[in-house]
């Protein structure tokens, strides 16, 4: 059985993430979406909320897809899941530099697990969770970048935390 891992913070999960999940699920028998905390980021949603959000969003995608949280080195997590492939999405050259370096480090940690890069769909390339949150904080429309359920959750969380800025 070919198992792949698609790791990310998914804060929030975007249409770009969904595209990579759909396509990644076709490449493996089981795709494990690893929801993690990035210690360099300040999340809008906590781990449990992000895991639940991702589970809801991927429920209709065809294939054996599991969503789990992890808080360890990616390669340790991938090995525990029995993965032979790490799936990563690339939007632009800047992503490639970072991802190339990470793939090299991961290969040093475990050379039995390959990293596979999927290019983002052209229409989804500019989408980034960080930008979605920023746009929402300033009152911009985010419905083009996330599903309706995620849009509602992001707007509600920003209001709940009093993060709204600027005038519209």
From Swiss-Prot:
GO molecular function annotation: ATP binding; pantetheine-phosphate adenylyltransferase activity
Positions bound to ATP: 9-10, 17, 89-91, 99, 124-130
UniProt function note: Reversibly transfers an adenylyl group from ATP to 4'-phosphopantetheine, yielding dephospho-CoA (dPCoA) and pyrophosphate.
Protein's UniProt keywords contain Zinc: no
Cross-referenced Gene3D superfamilies: HUPs (3.40.50.620)
Signal peptide: none
Cofactor dependence: Mg(2+)
GO biological process: coenzyme A biosynthetic process
PANTHER family in alphabetical order: PHOSPHOPANTETHEINE ADENYLYLTRANSFERASE
Catalytic activity: (R)-4'-phosphopantetheine + ATP + H(+) = 3'-dephospho-CoA + diphosphate
Protein name per its UniProtKB record: Phosphopantetheine adenylyltransferase
Subcellular location, record wording: Cytoplasm
Lineage summary: Bacteria, Pseudomonadati, Pseudomonadota, Alphaproteobacteria, Sphingomonadales
Keywords, sorted A to Z: ATP-binding, Coenzyme A biosynthesis, Cytoplasm, Magnesium, Nucleotide-binding, Nucleotidyltransferase, Transferase
Enzyme Commission number(s): 2.7.7.3
Family: Belongs to the bacterial CoaD family.
Pfam families xrefs: CTP_transf_like
UniProt site positions, description: Transition state stabilizer: 17
Subunit note: Homohexamer.
GO cellular component: cytoplasm
Binding-site list for substrate: 9, 41, 74, 88
Gene: coaD
Database matches in HAMAP family: PPAT_bact (MF_00151)
Superkingdom as given in the UniProt entry: Bacteria
Pathway assigned in UniProt: Cofactor biosynthesis; coenzyme A biosynthesis; CoA from (R)-pantothenate: step 4/5
């Amino acid at each position: 059985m070919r198992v792949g891992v698609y790791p990310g913070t998914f804060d929030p999960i975007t249409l770009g993430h969904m595209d990579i999940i759909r396509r990644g699920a076709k490449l493996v028998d089981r795709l494990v979406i690893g929801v993690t905390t990035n210690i360099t980021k300040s999340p809008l949603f906590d781990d449990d909320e992000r895991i639940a959000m991702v589970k809801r969003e991927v429920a209709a995608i065809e294939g054996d897809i599991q969503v789990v949280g992890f808080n360890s080195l990616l390669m340790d997590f991938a090995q525990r899941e029995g993965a032979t492939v790490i799936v990563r999405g690339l939007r632009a050259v800047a992503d490639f530099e970072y991802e190339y370096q990470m793939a090299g480090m991961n290969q040093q940690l475990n050379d039995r697990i390959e990293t596979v890069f999927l290019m983002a769909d052209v229409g989804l390339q500019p989408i980034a969770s960080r930008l979605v949150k920023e746009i929402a904080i300033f009152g911009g429309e985010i419905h083009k970048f996330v599903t309706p359920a995620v849009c509602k959750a992001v707007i509600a969380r920003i209001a709940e935390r009093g993060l709204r800025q600027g005038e519209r």
